[in-house]
């Protein structure tokens, strides 16, 4: 249904990289989610009222909170689509992440309240009144939530929306929660054993779990996280396709919201190359990154010696030392500066964040190996952390 609506109401609906199309998908899915959740709330609330079931009533109000979540997501997409201004030169894209976080908080609050009321129901149980109509409503709810989880996950992945992925997780947890309520309903109707309150606790725990998972997924891009490996590979392929670029390092992808990405990196170029030609190459690369990946790029040129035999030999030697210590280690910006009494060997090493050995121990190990072979060489080592894995 959502696919059909997208074809009818979203112009150029296949072009999901276009910010306008992406925003339209978010708004469409938000409206559909509001409608579905209001229908489910109404039917479940009536079913819970007539059956005196706390689990069904709680599940109904969970759907009402889902409708509120869909409204927040819809508003978030609208606000995130605003153009950059003087106060927010990088746009408003991160509002989408904030809306996803608000949805997560609502999910957690609803789960807490449900567990609280269900525990009370365990100690003060009431005999529920079930009927085939009640069971039919629950089955209908499970099918609807399954569909909502599928379309939110599919479109969320397609347009790269953490808010919609959070909604998909919420819908999936709702489906599982309603299934638990249905099982409890059937067991109570068949055996006379009242497990309504216990089912409510299970539903509440599912909701709490889904809320924390969704919060984690929305907080990560707000705090900053590594870029997708596919994007890193695309950047590498584009930059290294130019003959004047020997290598790249210090790649950082700054995410200011979906479709608002800034790339900064260091491009290694021949130290003896023509500066005008090299600068022209860098400009061309920045333009290609912007055109192909829709990312603004800032590239710093790092001159690298490609003709000095001593530098190349020592670089290969140090690279071998790093491989002996751990293949996960790498280096860049390698150069040597000769003086009257000693020679400085200057380079940066890249160490993963979760590396079990301290930075100082790694540097000491490298320095010891170099000075064993070259006693008059001093090392000047800077440590970089592997932002991009």
Predicted regions and their residues:
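Peripheral (non-transmembrane) domains and long loops of multi-pass membrane proteins
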Residues: 1-26, 217-389
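Alpha-helical transmembrane cores and adjacent cytosolic helix/loop segments
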Residues: 1-240
């Amino acid at each position: 249904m959502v696919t059909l609506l997208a074809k009818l109401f979203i112009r150029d609906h296949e072009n999901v990289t276009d910010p306008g199309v992406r925003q339209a998908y978010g708004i469409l899915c938000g409206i559909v989610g509001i409608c579905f959740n209001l229908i489910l709330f109404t039917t479940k609330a009536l079913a819970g009222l007539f059956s005196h079931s706390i689990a069904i009533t709680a599940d109904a109000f969970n759907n009402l909170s889902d409708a509120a979540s869909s409204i927040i997501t819809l508003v978030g997409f609208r606000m995130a689509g605003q153009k950059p201004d003087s106060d927010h030169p990088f746009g408003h894209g991160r509002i989408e992440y904030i809306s996803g976080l608000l949805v997560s908080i609502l999910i957690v609050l609803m789960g807490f309240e449900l567990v609280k009321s269900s525990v009370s129901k365990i100690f003060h149980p009431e005999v529920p009144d079930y009927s085939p109509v009640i069971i039919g409503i629950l089955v209908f709810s499970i099918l609807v939530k399954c569909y909502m989880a599928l379309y939110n996950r599919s479109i969320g992945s397609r347009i790269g929306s953490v808010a919609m992925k959070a909604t998909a997780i919420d819908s999936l947890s709702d489906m599982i929660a309603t299934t638990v309520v249905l099982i409890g309903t059937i067991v109570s109707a068949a055996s006379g054993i009242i497990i309504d309150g216990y089912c409510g606790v299970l539903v509440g725990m599912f909701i709490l779990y889904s809320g924390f998972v969704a919060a984690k997924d929305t907080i990560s891009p707000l705090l900053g996280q590594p870029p997708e490996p596919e994007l890193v590979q695309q950047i590498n392929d584009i930059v290294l396709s130019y003959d004047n670029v020997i290598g790249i390092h210090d790649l950082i992808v700054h995410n200011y919201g979906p479709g608002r990405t800034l790339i900064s990196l260091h491009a290694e170029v021949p130290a003896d190359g023509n500066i005008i030609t090299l600068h022209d190459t860098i400009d061309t690369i920045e333009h290609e990154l912007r055109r192909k990946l829709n990312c603004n790029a800032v590239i710093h040129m790092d001159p690298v010696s490609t003709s000095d035999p001593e530098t190349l030999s020592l670089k290969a030697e140090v690279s071998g030392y790093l491989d002996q210590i751990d293949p996960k280690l790498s280096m860049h910006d390698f150069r040597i500066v000769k003086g009257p009494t000693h020679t400085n060997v200057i380079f940066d090493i890249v160490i993963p964040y979760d590396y079990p050995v301290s930075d100082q121990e790694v540097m000491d190990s490298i320095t010891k190996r170099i000075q064993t072979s070259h006693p008059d060489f001093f090392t000047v080592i800077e440590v970089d952390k592997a932002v991009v894995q």
